[in-house]
Amino acid sequence: MTTKDVDFFGKTRGHIQAIHNEISALSKSKPDVPINKFKLGFINEKLRETNTLLKGAFKPFEKFETFDEDALPTNSDVVLVLAQYLDCLESWRCANIHSDDFNWYWKVDGESIETERPTRYRKS
């Protein structure tokens, strides 16, 4: 793992979280309304980026890559999928951090990059 990986993770998780928050708000009032193609384009772009991190056991859905732009998903569909991606991103992060005297750090060669406490911890 490199510092670029850590930076990419932070950027990617931030984007997925922001989109999830926005679509969750829409879904509360209009869960069954299809998302528009403009928003779906951005969502799919971020999903493609996230898929480069989440491989193997970390991938939320084995056969899912992005939403089909011809069959527009509903707001609630997008919220469901993004919630799974956020959970898998946290699992990936937990597998790539370690603790040292109550502080948590990314497993990066030659550097100590501090991170927040994990929501779950998996020894690797």
Which residues does each predicted region cover?
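Charged interaction/catalytic cores of defense and host-pathogen modules
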Residues: T2-F102
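Short acidic DE-rich linear segments
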Residues: W104-S124
